[in-house]
Protein backbone atom coordinates (compact mmCIF):
# COMPACT_ATOMS: atom_id res chain seq x y z
CA UNK A 1 0.00 0.00 0.00
CA UNK A 2 1.28 3.45 -0.91
CA UNK A 3 2.38 5.92 1.75
CA UNK A 4 -0.32 8.23 3.07
CA UNK A 5 -0.62 11.68 1.52
CA UNK A 6 -3.27 13.15 3.77
CA UNK A 7 -5.15 12.94 7.03
CA UNK A 8 -8.84 13.67 7.45
CA UNK A 9 -10.24 14.68 10.84
CA UNK A 10 -13.78 13.39 11.35
CA UNK A 11 -15.07 15.21 14.45
CA UNK A 12 -17.46 14.12 17.13
CA UNK A 13 -21.08 15.17 16.83
CA UNK A 14 -22.35 18.32 18.46
CA UNK A 15 -21.66 20.99 15.90
CA UNK A 16 -19.34 23.91 16.24
CA UNK A 17 -16.67 24.98 13.79
CA UNK A 18 -14.29 22.07 13.32
CA UNK A 19 -11.39 24.43 12.59
CA UNK A 20 -11.60 25.97 16.07
CA UNK A 21 -13.12 23.22 18.23
CA UNK A 22 -10.90 21.36 20.69
CA UNK A 23 -7.71 19.95 19.20
CA UNK A 24 -8.95 19.61 15.60
CA UNK A 25 -7.56 22.88 14.26
CA UNK A 26 -4.35 22.55 16.28
CA UNK A 27 -3.69 19.06 14.87
CA UNK A 28 -4.57 20.19 11.34
CA UNK A 29 -2.06 23.05 11.54
CA UNK A 30 0.61 20.74 12.91
CA UNK A 31 0.12 18.13 10.20
CA UNK A 32 -0.05 20.74 7.43
CA UNK A 33 3.56 21.65 8.28
CA UNK A 34 4.72 18.25 7.02
CA UNK A 35 6.04 18.72 3.46
CA UNK A 36 3.78 17.13 0.85
CA UNK A 37 1.14 16.17 3.40
CA UNK A 38 -2.39 17.54 3.61
CA UNK A 39 -4.85 17.54 6.50
CA UNK A 40 -8.55 18.22 6.08
CA UNK A 41 -10.81 19.34 8.92
CA UNK A 42 -14.15 20.29 7.42
CA UNK A 43 -17.49 20.94 9.04
CA UNK A 44 -19.65 17.87 8.61
CA UNK A 45 -23.25 17.90 7.39
CA UNK A 46 -25.87 16.87 9.97
CA UNK A 47 -23.45 17.73 12.81
CA UNK A 48 -25.79 16.99 15.73
CA UNK A 49 -27.14 13.52 14.89
CA UNK A 50 -24.18 12.61 12.65
CA UNK A 51 -26.25 10.15 10.61
CA UNK A 52 -24.29 7.39 8.96
CA UNK A 53 -26.38 7.79 5.79
CA UNK A 54 -25.07 11.37 5.48
CA UNK A 55 -21.56 11.17 6.93
CA UNK A 56 -20.19 8.14 5.08
CA UNK A 57 -21.07 9.47 1.60
CA UNK A 58 -19.55 12.84 2.61
CA UNK A 59 -16.35 11.07 3.68
CA UNK A 60 -16.17 9.39 0.28
CA UNK A 61 -17.22 12.18 -2.09
CA UNK A 62 -16.14 15.36 -0.27
CA UNK A 63 -13.23 14.26 1.93
CA UNK A 64 -12.02 11.61 -0.55
CA UNK A 65 -10.98 9.10 2.09
CA UNK A 66 -9.03 6.38 0.30
CA UNK A 67 -6.06 4.00 0.62
CA UNK A 68 -3.68 6.98 1.01
CA UNK A 69 -5.73 8.55 3.81
CA UNK A 70 -5.25 8.47 7.56
CA UNK A 71 -8.71 8.97 9.07
CA UNK A 72 -8.56 10.60 12.50
CA UNK A 73 -11.95 10.04 14.09
CA UNK A 74 -13.03 11.46 17.45
CA UNK A 75 -16.02 10.06 19.34
CA UNK A 76 -18.88 9.86 16.79
CA UNK A 77 -16.21 10.50 14.16
CA UNK A 78 -14.36 7.37 15.31
CA UNK A 79 -17.57 5.40 14.87
CA UNK A 80 -18.00 6.83 11.36
CA UNK A 81 -14.38 5.95 10.57
CA UNK A 82 -14.87 2.34 11.65
CA UNK A 83 -18.08 1.93 9.62
CA UNK A 84 -16.38 3.56 6.62
CA UNK A 85 -13.48 1.10 6.85
CA UNK A 86 -15.90 -1.83 6.73
CA UNK A 87 -16.42 -1.10 3.02
CA UNK A 88 -13.48 1.13 1.96
CA UNK A 89 -9.71 0.71 1.97
CA UNK A 90 -7.89 3.34 4.01
CA UNK A 91 -4.26 3.63 5.04
CA UNK A 92 -4.91 4.05 8.75
CA UNK A 93 -7.53 4.71 11.39
CA UNK A 94 -6.65 6.79 14.42
CA UNK A 95 -9.59 6.34 16.76
CA UNK A 96 -10.00 8.77 19.65
CA UNK A 97 -12.67 7.96 22.25
CA UNK A 98 -14.13 5.04 20.28
CA UNK A 99 -17.01 2.89 21.48
CA UNK A 100 -19.22 0.02 20.32
CA UNK A 101 -22.87 0.71 21.25
CA UNK A 102 -25.42 3.52 21.31
CA UNK A 103 -24.83 3.74 25.08
CA UNK A 104 -28.60 3.93 25.58
CA UNK A 105 -28.60 7.41 24.02
CA UNK A 106 -31.47 8.32 21.68
CA UNK A 107 -29.30 10.58 19.49
CA UNK A 108 -26.65 7.86 19.11
CA UNK A 109 -29.38 5.35 18.20
CA UNK A 110 -30.77 7.76 15.57
CA UNK A 111 -27.35 8.02 13.90
CA UNK A 112 -27.76 4.53 12.45
CA UNK A 113 -24.26 3.28 13.25
CA UNK A 114 -25.45 0.79 15.85
CA UNK A 115 -28.26 -0.90 13.92
CA UNK A 116 -26.19 -4.00 13.04
CA UNK A 117 -23.16 -5.94 14.26
CA UNK A 118 -19.67 -4.55 13.70
CA UNK A 119 -17.68 -6.17 10.90
CA UNK A 120 -14.35 -6.20 12.73
CA UNK A 121 -12.58 -8.51 10.28
CA UNK A 122 -13.54 -6.35 7.30
CA UNK A 123 -12.23 -3.24 9.06
CA UNK A 124 -8.90 -4.96 9.72
CA UNK A 125 -8.71 -6.28 6.14
CA UNK A 126 -9.34 -2.80 4.69
CA UNK A 127 -7.05 -0.91 7.04
CA UNK A 128 -3.49 -2.08 7.81
CA UNK A 129 -2.83 0.46 10.59
CA UNK A 130 -5.23 0.99 13.50
CA UNK A 131 -4.29 3.18 16.45
CA UNK A 132 -6.55 4.08 19.34
CA UNK A 133 -6.45 6.72 22.06
CA UNK A 134 -8.68 6.18 25.07
CA UNK A 135 -8.94 7.38 28.65
CA UNK A 136 -10.29 5.51 31.65
CA UNK A 137 -11.78 8.74 33.03
CA UNK A 138 -13.91 9.49 29.94
CA UNK A 139 -17.19 10.84 31.38
CA UNK A 140 -19.23 9.67 28.37
CA UNK A 141 -17.73 6.29 27.47
CA UNK A 142 -17.25 3.27 29.69
CA UNK A 143 -13.69 1.93 29.50
CA UNK A 144 -15.09 -1.52 28.71
CA UNK A 145 -16.35 -0.31 25.31
CA UNK A 146 -13.10 1.48 24.48
CA UNK A 147 -11.15 -1.67 25.38
CA UNK A 148 -13.49 -3.79 23.25
CA UNK A 149 -12.67 -1.67 20.18
CA UNK A 150 -8.94 -2.13 20.83
CA UNK A 151 -9.32 -5.88 21.34
CA UNK A 152 -11.55 -6.50 18.31
CA UNK A 153 -9.38 -4.43 15.96
CA UNK A 154 -5.99 -5.42 17.40
CA UNK A 155 -5.40 -1.68 17.67
CA UNK A 156 -2.24 -0.16 19.06
CA UNK A 157 -3.81 1.33 22.18
CA UNK A 158 -2.61 4.46 23.94
CA UNK A 159 -4.39 4.23 27.28
CA UNK A 160 -4.62 7.31 29.49
CA UNK A 161 -6.16 7.89 32.90
CA UNK A 162 -6.50 11.69 32.76
CA UNK A 163 -7.72 12.81 29.31
CA UNK A 164 -11.46 12.47 29.74
CA UNK A 165 -13.16 12.64 26.35
CA UNK A 166 -10.09 14.21 24.70
CA UNK A 167 -11.57 17.69 24.52
CA UNK A 168 -8.27 19.45 25.16
CA UNK A 169 -6.88 22.04 22.74
CA UNK A 170 -3.60 20.29 21.89
CA UNK A 171 -2.81 16.66 21.12
CA UNK A 172 0.94 16.12 20.80
CA UNK A 173 0.75 12.31 20.91
CA UNK A 174 -1.55 12.24 17.90
CA UNK A 175 0.85 14.36 15.84
CA UNK A 176 3.72 12.02 16.82
CA UNK A 177 1.73 8.95 15.76
CA UNK A 178 0.95 10.41 12.33
CA UNK A 179 4.57 11.47 11.83
CA UNK A 180 5.73 7.96 12.74
CA UNK A 181 3.59 6.57 9.91
CA UNK A 182 5.26 8.91 7.43
CA UNK A 183 8.82 8.10 8.48
CA UNK A 184 10.22 5.06 6.67
CA UNK A 185 11.58 2.38 8.95
CA UNK A 186 15.35 2.58 9.23
From Swiss-Prot:
Gene3D superfamilies noted in UniProt: alpha/beta hydrolase
Pfam families, per database record: Ser_hydrolase
A single GO molecular function term of this UniProt record: serine hydrolase activity
Enzyme class: hydrolase
Outcome of mutating residue 63 to Q: Loss of binding to RB1 binding
Catalytic activity reported: valacyclovir + H2O = acyclovir + L-valine + H(+)
Positions of region (Involved in binding to RB1): 63-67
Active-site residues (renumbered): 75 (charge relay system), 138 (charge relay system), 165 (charge relay system)
Record's keyword terms, sorted: Hydrolase
EC number(s) given by UniProt: 3.1.-.-
Superkingdom as given in the UniProt entry: Eukaryota
Tissue expression: Highly expressed in the spleen, testis and kidney. Also found in the heart, liver, lung and brain.
Primary role: Serine hydrolase. Catalyzes the hydrolytic activation of amino acid ester of the antiviral prodrug valacyclovir to its corresponding active drug, acyclovir. May negatively regulate basal or autocrine TGF-beta signaling by suppressing SMAD2-SMAD3 phosphorylation. May play a role in the transformation process due to its capacity to confer resistance to the growth-inhibitory effects of TGF-beta through interaction with RB1 and the subsequent displacement of E2F1.
Family membership: Belongs to the RBBP9 family.
Subunit structure: Interacts with RB1; the interaction disrupts RB1 binding to E2F1. Interacts with RBL1 and RBL2.
Name assigned to this protein: Serine hydrolase RBBP9
Amino acid sequence: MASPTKAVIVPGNGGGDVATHGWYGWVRKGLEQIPGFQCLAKNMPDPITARESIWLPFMETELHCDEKTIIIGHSSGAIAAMRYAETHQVYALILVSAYTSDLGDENERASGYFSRPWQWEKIKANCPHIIQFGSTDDPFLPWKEQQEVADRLDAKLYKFTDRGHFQNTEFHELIRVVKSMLTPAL
